[in-house]
Amino acid sequence: MFVASKQADEQKKLVIEQEVQKRQFKKIEELKADMQKGVNPFFKVLFDGGNRLFGFPETFIYSSIFILFVTIVLSVILFQAYEPVLIVAIVIVLVALGFKKDYRLYQRMERAMKFKKPFLFKGVKNKAFMSIFSMKPSKEMANDIHLNPNREDRLVSAANSYLANNYECFLDDGVILTNNYSLLGTIKLGGIDFLTTSKKDLIELHASIYSVFRNFVTPEFKFYFHTVKKKIVIDETNRDYSLIFSNDFMRAYNEKQKRESFYDISFYLTIEQDLLDTLNEPVMNKKHFADNNFEEFQRIIRAKLENFKDRIELIEELLSKYHPIRLKEYTKDGVIYSKQCEFYNFLVGMNEAPFICNRKDLYLKEKMHGGVKEVYFANKHGKILNDDLSEKYFSAIEISEYAPKSQSDLFDKINALDSEFIFMHAYSPKNSQVLKDKLAFTSRRIIISGGSKEQGMTLGCLSELVGNGDITLGSYGNSLVLFADSFEKMKQSVKECVSSLNAKGFLANAATFSMENYFFAKHCSFITLPFIFDVTSNNFADFIAMRAMSFDGNQENNAWGNSVMTLKSEINSPFYLNFHMPTDFGSASAGHTLILGSTGSGKTVFMSMTLNAMGQFVHNFPANVSKDKQKLTMVYMDKDYGAYGNIVAMGGEYVKIELGTDTGLNPFAWAACVQKTNATMEQKQTAISVVKELVKNLATKSDEKDENGNSISFSLADSNTLAAAVTNLITGDMNLDYPITQLINAFGKDHNDPNGLVARLAPFCKSTNGEFQWLFDNKATDRLDFSKTIIGVDGSSFLDNNDVSPFICFYLFARIQEAMDGRRFVLDIDEAWKYLGDPKVAYFVRDMLKTARKRNAIVRLATQSITDLLACPIADTIREQCPTKIFLRNDGGNLSDYQRLANVTEKEFEIITKGLDRKILYKQDGSPSVIASFNLRGIPKEYLKILSTDTVFVKEIDKIIQNHSIIDKYQALRQMYQQIKEY
């Protein structure tokens, strides 16, 4: 019976063990599945219950027992006094309750005391890093921050303990040796456009960060990652836009942008290799540096240096998609500077300044003060006094509790804060043996402290993942320091930051007791961090996810010079809008742009706004551009008068072509004019060819056409006769009033032939009172004048009339192409599908799109309906020839249409249909897409009315144009809108 009972117990234990293994296996699979999705658990067992003895820090238990024992000996045995024992016991209980509430309290107190009372911690007393950190109480400053005059000794101590890594000297280009015998190198990394990139692609990109820290499992390496958000001022108020309204509008816009809060967000990864604790080699210690055998020492250093550089190159390769740039030396005006030291200097007080590199300098630390004169600490805030006597306020944020799981979007809200900050994450990997010891130690502590089975299972899962190489572990700490120009702004920033962190599942608050620790730890230092705990390599990778904006355009040195204008991205960084592809100033670059936006999305406002901004390109040409080409012409092909007021206010001519009214167009007169200019023979022949083609199109208007729009029944003989007559009329020295009439008169013998040339051209002739006589049979002065800077042409009346629209459009585009002669040229075509409806016109524009870049011209095609544009005969050419696409909101869009015309991703389409309110989605070939705002709030409302003309104001604008006594049409428009009661 005993044997049977024993077997039953063993069987029961086996079943339980199998069940535990199943549960553990299931949990591991769940964890792996989450990790594949970019969701990584925090193993709090490593820094919560597992690191405590009976729920309290082990050292606290031992020190409390010792203090209580000493108190009893001194008070009870020697003096028979029980009160001290009671007091000490109460203090211990109160502190214990504090530890129960916040298990980090003990470590924070211990590390903070290194600043408060450093004489108790001899191990951290180093040579003073910066003498500038001194406390000088000031009544004036006390008005802003309640300073504690008794903290001077603490601050001096803090300076003494500022950094474990005091910079000693340059060891190589981009490598600095510290006085703790470690090497430092820093890489600047670009962000990922997380708002416009699909979740799947983000996970794949983020996996490259995971791989970096799985490759480093030795404690000789430490990593310091800095997210730096710096306020910048966008000042473009000195730009000259040449046109009166353009100057007024853009001045108002640029002044508004100058007042806006713009930030530059950057990411830096600093790698530290400790030369004293190198594994797998004879340990090198400080006595090597006191040896007389310097050659051997230098050989070791060189070997370590090469190894260090190889590791940095490996990291750069693994993070290649983040566009890594090593911070090295650079030369300016014959002087060598160090980008690396400039960055370390910047971390002191967020002051930017050049740093001259001297390889022989052995006392870098004496120069690395960051332009800071004094630092003052109060309870929750501090103040920096710079060398130039400017002031900056700061506050540190302490994160007490972390969310249960980490993801790459953990700190997105922090990156979007309306505040300057430096967010430092420090990570030191553990080697395999240390990991095993750590897990075994934690396992014992769980048992001793009465931990739960869940904790044990979690630890088992962690051991399995570490053993399989899925993750590694390391020590981690962080320092988040906010900066502001005023105390009120500082308080507001702290409030927003704490609120943002708490919303993500953290427990955060403004640091008080440990503020000095956080302030000094933001450099590259573990020693001053108030709290260090263990996290997985994936957790750390999530903390440092570089989610920002990798493409911000170019502010300067573009094809035509400066950027068109500055917009604001979703993370409050500047986006420098350009239509040209990135290139050097003066280079021929593709700038054709497709603009898509539904009714009410702000398409007309955006086009008019940017048209005004491009007025600046009338100035500043490369030296190799001839004088006659140093000009700018902008042509706006309008519909429904949307740009009417804007063109007039800019001082341009607005050509309205009305059905049945003489257009003022005379192609013959234009071609004859070209013959008398200094145009090349090719240009002269082209002008004649255009008129020949146009007249042939008129003559074959009613004929049946093939797929290319050519007449099937028009004979070659008639074609040759017509061509010869057109050439004679243009090249002959005669009056070209009513050229169609003159052409018909030349074909007198054809009068009675219903299919003859006379009959074919009669509808366009005044002498025969033709239906379309108003088109081209006009006086000998052509209305179109492309010598002006801005011209508008409205197609509202004729675009829907298929009888005349193809001819007008053909002639307009032919004239425009002739004007693209090497000058800077902008052609805007609103509702482009209407202008390109005829195949012959479409193919003509197709050829123009292919050659315009070489002519220094850009074409911007816009439409409300992407479906209509897809029906255009040259839709494929538009997609290929327009490297820049700009999308405004379209709630009713179709994904397949957007993919076909503009290669839009599902994520981008989701943004277009849901996320664009007075914003654009900018997409340029070879660059990530960007969401940017063109918010015009604060701009005078009469300016906004001018940018986009409502049809109810068309007649009022007509009156202003027709009233020749009104000299300044722009001011008349302003007054008209200002007088409207709504404004």
Swiss-Prot record:
It is an enzyme of class 7 (translocase). Pfam families: CagE_TrbE_VirB, P-loop_TraG. It is found in: Cell inner membrane. Its EC number is 7.4.2.8. One of its GO terms (cellular component) is plasma membrane. It is a peripheral membrane protein. One of its GO terms (molecular function) is ATP binding. Disruption phenotype: Deletion of the gene affects pilus synthesis. Mutant is unable to translocate CagA and is unable to induce IL-8 secretion by gastric epithelial cells. Deletion has no effect on assembly of the Cag outer membrane complex, but the mutant machine completely lacks the entire cytoplasmic complex. ATP binds at residues 597-604. The keyword Membrane applies. Its main location: membrane. It comes from the Bacteria. It catalyses: ATP + H2O + cellular proteinSide 1 = ADP + phosphate + cellular proteinSide 2. Keywords: ATP-binding, Cell inner membrane, Cell membrane, Membrane, Nucleotide-binding, Translocase, Virulence. InterPro entries: ATPase_P-typ_TM_dom_sf, CagE_TrbE_VirB, CagE_TrbE_VirB_cntrl_dom, P-loop_NTPase, P-loop_TraG, T4SS_component. PANTHER family: TYPE IV SECRETION SYSTEM PROTEIN CAGE (PTHR30121:SF12), UNCHARACTERIZED PROTEIN YJGR-RELATED (PTHR30121). Belongs to the TrbE/VirB4 family. ATPase component of the type IV secretion system Cag (Cag-T4SS). Acts as a molecular motor to provide the energy that is required for the export of proteins. Required for CagA translocation and induction of IL-8 in host gastric epithelial cells. Plays a key role in Cag-T4SS pilus biogenesis, especially in the localization and stabilization of the pilus-associated components CagI, CagL and the surface protein CagH. Is also critical for assembly of the entire cytoplasmic portion of the Cag inner membrane complex (IMC). Component of the Cag type IV secretion system, which is composed of a wheel-shaped outer membrane complex (OMC) and an inner membrane complex (IMC). Interacts with CagV and CagBeta. This is Type IV secretion system protein CagE. It comes from Helicobacter pylori (strain ATCC 700392 / 26695) (Campylobacter pylori). The lineage of its organism: Bacteria, Pseudomonadati, Campylobacterota, Epsilonproteobacteria, Campylobacterales. The gene is cagE.
